[in-house]
Amino acid sequence: MSAVVTYLRLARLIVHLLVGLGKVGLLFPFLSAVGREARVQRWSRQLVAICGVRMRFDQTLQAQPVSPALIICNHISWLDIFVINTLHTCRFVAKSDIRGWPLIGWLCEHTGTIFIARGRARDVRRIYEGLVKSIHDGERVAFFPEGTTAPQGTVLPFHAN
């Protein structure tokens, strides 16, 4: 890939992120849960396309009705969240440090990310209760039990908290 194409993709990605921040800040407070999910799904599809990722899903997977679920994922890239959201939007569990990241932390917080303070036993109970409530409310919740990214085909030890 040429340097020009790389810089154009990066510029499109930055603009896409800024547009997403604007939509979350200005539109999300007035949208229903279904409306927010549709926008997250569309935004994620566009982001994945900007990055040049091609996806292919099994037709039976696409045809499944959206239902409450707890999804356990192997984390291989920062794109994982967006790839998952292209099929069915989810709330994700993430380390609390992410909340402090400029722009990304705000975006995660306002799109329903559930933050956990690693190593704090009391926080595990709070997260558990939040997960149960989300699933009872009909949402899908996803998390990466390895707690970090790993090369494709590699499974790291799971973190209990």
What does each model-identified segment do?
Residues 1-56, 106-111:
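A transmembrane-helix-recognition feature enriched in membrane-embedded lipid enzymes
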